[in-house]
Amino acid sequence: GVVRTLDDFREAHDPTYKILAPTTVYSRDLKPAKRYLITAAQNATPVHKVWWRGLQTMTKKLGAELLVIPMRYKNPTSQWSGSQQNAEHWATEVRPFLWNVRHPLNANLTVLADLKVQPTMSSPLSGAEAVSLESSGIIGHTKLQLRSIPTAPGRMAKLLTTSGACTEANYTDSRAGRIGEFHHSLSAILVEVDGKRFHLRPVHFDAKTASCTDLDTRYTAKGSGRAPRPLALVMGDTHVDAICPLVEKATFGEGGIVETLNPQHLIWHDLLDSYSVNPHHAGNPFNAVAKRQTGTDDAKAEVQRAIEFVRKRTTKDTFSVIVGSNHNDMLRRWIVSNDWRRDPVNAEFYLETALAMVRGTKLTGKGTEYPDPFAYWFRLANVPNSRVLDLDESFMLGGVALDMHGNEGPNGSRGSIHNLRRIGVKSIIGHGHSPGTDEGCDQAGTSTRLKLEYNSGPSSWLNSHVVLHADCKRQHIFIIEGEWRA
């Protein structure tokens, strides 16, 4: 017959083509709640029994509403019989919790359950940055990915994250299927709502311990209890002289993150701000005037403040690790390029530092090597239970690399979460001030105020840390208006 429409053409030329029935709407009368657990389930696929029971434990203990976002995937090679007979078939356990409509959890966070994304999509958040408008958003997907999205000046950056899954990995015997299976994450997003404010944290199932950890609590199929001490707290870039007082209190104050979680290690990125010797101020007389008026042009005093900040916050049973960072390195850049004769305020400190660097300079097989000036002064201060890492010095805990700041990428390129996500080991970095999760890499945010002199315009900066739990799972902790949990 005559082909009249696109559907006629497809049906005539593609024997596998069929017009799908209208989408079934899954929702229920959802009462406003303080906490929500959000995950995803693949069609015609069983739940992971132990993880599902752990989710039930969390739901009960936290008094949370559980939302399971349904995902469709055609898999003719599925090991589970009949998986392709009905695209609308879901495991019995998840059916009462299915949710596939768009729904605001509060004024600033929306569940984008109507956004259907294939489980094998390598970047499930791609293109969805504006879908939720000014609201943060959660998208159902088996691969965990998180981004901080820039917003207009004067507004807090928004978060976009996927949910992780509660069902077993069930992918085709293909390249895309194998990659999808590799990134399949048994996880969920825990949301705490407090008026217009919300707190959002990913929770990961750990097969070795058959549990998941949220902050200081471990959940299993049988119950909950105190979680073991985390291996480390990787803090958003510190910049001591520019640190936000609310973030400092939330992190180190009474009832704060460090007191509550009691991490074994504190990992410091951009500890030193180097405002006194910032190379970007060169030639700007107004920066010089402002610094002279406030005494913030004294490099030695700034270095000492940074060192003492660590000393006062490193307890007897905690170990501090200072990661080599680009702002710490500004001290070296100042020594290399500046003339002490033109800087009487810092002349003595400059000469003393330069002399130590000269005495430590040597020519090796790699080329010229000389001491890092900030590392030199930090070691000279003898801060107990602390260590400052040299350039390219490895430091790993639980199989996760914690030694990279994030400013340097592969083969001399500029670093980013994107080009550090596939280097063969998991990692937690800083540098960008914009929190994120992308495959093997997590990026902490910043501990500074969210608006500084060098981030004008739309910004994706957020105050956040990343905790490395005892089970080696990583979890973002966001500090919103001085609060880190509801």
Predicted regions and their residues:
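Extended recognition/assembly regions associated with phosphoester-bond processing machinery
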Residues: G1-A486
